[in-house]
């Protein structure tokens, strides 16, 4: 792609935003926003080193800049890059309005993915990633050894965060970490992730409740026990899947049973007909709203696909 083609893709006002976000404060070597963006895109495309960027700047006629000099410019460009990301998105996403009930929350979809270290050893690492769902920007990330599994403890959470996560995060430790930070959560859970209780501390069975709900979203106030064995109130929200989803789930279960040579219990198979999440959100937020919000989580999976296909994130330099 040449410079002319690149300019056609940029949103209106990108030059003014560059100066407003202080990506360029002094016109030395890099004298205009387009040249800065060219260097940034070159650096991000295909595991380029800082020395590579310095050489590219010289050969492309931008000017002479050291590797350290570019890194300083790159770090100052964070807010401008975020602005570009938000304004270059397709209109349906860019203009999607956050529902009123979510206005006071920073909604984070979290997930993890494997990345491989280059070389003969090919060591596996884990990338833990938090996506702000209403700006579609990275809120935080962390790279750990493969032995560090999915847990909300991998993220720094604060009051006002609403974390959306899949079943891998449905543990007491993750929930405790979230609540201790003053955050809220919507987490999909397994059939028997941990014991759940009624207000009197008696164990109750999730599948028994699922058998009582109809075709509309339902909620159930239950309790879990924290590490101090104290009851903590939460809600389980659930809805029955569509006939097409149930049929697809049955095919997936049969393939899984064949592959693992292990048959699931009838009770577990039954629960696969439903989608259910656990949440700390207040009761005035309906089950329909909570389940609808959870369905936005797939955006973080798309981020991993984009990172790996466009930026080669499948490996660590």
Question: Predicted regions span which residues?
Answer:
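Single, function-defining residue in the core of a domain
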Residues: 1-47, 55, 64-65, 69-72, ...
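Short glycine- and basic-residue-enriched patches
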Residues: 95-99, 104-110
């Amino acid at each position: 792609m040449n410079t002319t083609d690149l300019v056609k893709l940029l949103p209106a006002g990108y030059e003014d935003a560059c100066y407003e976000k202080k990506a360029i404060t002094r016109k030395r070597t890099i004298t205009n926003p387009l040249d800065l963006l060219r260097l940034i895109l070159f650096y991000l495309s295909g595991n380029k080193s800082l020395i590579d960027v310095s050489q590219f700047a010289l050969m492309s006629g931008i000017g002479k800049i050291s590797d350290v000099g570019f890194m300083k410019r790159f770090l100052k460009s964070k807010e401008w890059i975020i602005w570009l990301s938000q304004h270059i998105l397709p209109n349906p996403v860019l203009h999607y309005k956050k529902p009123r009930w979510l206005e006071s929350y920073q909604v984070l979809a979290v997930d993890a993915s494997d990345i491989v270290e280059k070389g003969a050893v090919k060591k596996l690492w884990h990338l833990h990633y938090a996506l702000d769902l209403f700006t579609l920007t990275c809120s935080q990330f962390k790279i750990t050894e493969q032995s560090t599994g999915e847990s909300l403890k991998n993220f720094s959470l604060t009051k006002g965060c609403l974390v959306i996560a899949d079943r891998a995060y449905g543990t007491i430790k993750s929930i405790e970490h979230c609540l201790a930070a003053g955050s809220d959560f919507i987490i999909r859970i397994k059939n028997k992730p941990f014991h759940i209780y009624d207000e009197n501390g008696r164990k109750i069975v999730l599948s028994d409740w699922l058998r009582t709900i109809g075709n509309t979203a339902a909620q159930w106030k239950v309790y879990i026990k924290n590490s101090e064995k104290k009851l903590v109130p939460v809600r389980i929200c659930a809805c029955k899947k569509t006939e097409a989803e149930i049929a697809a789930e049955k095919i997936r279960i049969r393939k899984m049973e064949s592959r693992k040579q292990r048959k699931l219990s009838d009770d577990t198979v039954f629960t696969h007909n439903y989608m259910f999440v656990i949440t700390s959100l207040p009761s005035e937020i309906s089950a329909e709203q909570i389940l609808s919000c959870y369905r936005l989580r797939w955006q973080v999976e798309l981020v991993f696909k984009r990172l790996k296909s466009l930026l080669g994130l499948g490996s660590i330099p």
